[in-house]
Amino acid sequence: MHKSEAPNEPEQLRKLFIGGLSFETTDESLREHFEQWGTLTDCVVMRDPNSKRSRGFGFVTYLSTDEVDAAMTARPHKVDGRVVEPKRAVSREDSSRPGAHLTVKKIFVGGIKEDTEEDHLREYFEQYGKIEVIEIMTDRGSGKKRGFAFVTFEDHDSVDKIVIQKYHTVNNHNSQVRKALSKQEMASVSGSQRERGGSGNYGSRGGFGNDNFGGRGGNFGGNRGGGGGFGNRGYGGDGYNGDGQLWWQPSLLGWNRGYGAGQGGGYGAGQGGGYGGGGQGGGYGGNGGYDGYNGGGSGFSGSGGNFGSSGGYNDFGNYNSQSSSNFGPMKGGNYGGGRNSGPYGGGYGGGSASSSSGYGGGRRF
């Protein structure tokens, strides 16, 4: 690659995760396929460091984000006779957030002000793809905006493209954007984590903050809600709103209120709890692993050596296992596949156990 061709965009935005690879696929055959849509600066099939057997996934990095977009537009892709699943690669920082590796079509948008209307959201977000639905949440009683909205897209890639970009400005206001997860999706995450956590610890390295998620009950919801379960109510009590109803069992991390519930709780408010809050790392997007390529349990290939074992790409705990010497932060933060140059050091897996409240709730939105 000539100096004049040096990439001028962040590597993370130019990288694709390629899942579902045939075990016969090599770096060369993967490159041969994906270079049809642009110049590749890197291409690798991840392999077991001992057996050298393919793990069934890899990464390709393009020279520009336009080429990434072109490759995603060309879906579906078939490599060596097998349909594969390309997705925008998630950074280590982002992989620690709830649902980071889930395929969803809806985003949560925080920081919505009173002067922000549906047209403002549409004007900004339609650059990422076709929008199906925009919902600005309002108070049932007063009709005032509650500070957040949901945007649903036609294609999950629009969501992936949005969330890997850190900053968004809607109607001249800074907005926080995350994937919006349904009750079922959050429950599937919690269930797989509990199965791997042994005694209710959340993640591969230690417990969930100072206590298990939901106090000392061990499971989501802890002692509240009849011995566990995924929280007791939906987004802040009854549905999206509520009058101070407890969403999670109170803990040292300040998860006192639900999604936008009364008395200052919810997303980014109140004692550091909720969505992106401060405090001791609580809230959506805390410090550590929630799902996907992080946590204990079996490795990516599982004992059977199949991609995703029995649960496909979202079999949360099959992507990384430090105890199984998979592609977590091993030597120098690399994937453990023998690559020490570092292009994958900021990728999937690793970190401490998460302290995230997530969306949770008993009602689907």
Swiss-Prot record:
UniProt keyword list: Cytoplasm, Nucleus, Repeat, Ribonucleoprotein, RNA-binding
UniProt-listed CDD domains: RRM1_hnRNPA1
Domain RRM: 14-97, 105-184
Region of interest (Nuclear targeting sequence), residue spans: 321-359
InterPro entries assigned to the protein according to its UniProt record, in alphabetical order: hnRNPA1_RRM1 (IPR034845), Nucleotide-bd_a/b_plait_sf (IPR012677), RBD_domain_sf (IPR035979), RRM_dom (IPR000504)
Transmembrane segments: none
Listed name of the protein: Heterogeneous nuclear ribonucleoproteins A1 homolog
GO MF terms held by the record: mRNA 3'-UTR binding
Region (Disordered), start-end ranges: 175-208, 328-365
Keyword Repeat: yes
Organism encoding this protein: Xenopus laevis
Protein encoded by which gene: hnrnpa1
Compositionally biased intervals (Gly residues): 198-208, 330-365
Xref: PROSITE patterns: RRM
GO terms under cellular component: catalytic step 2 spliceosome; cytoplasm
Pfam family, one: RRM_1
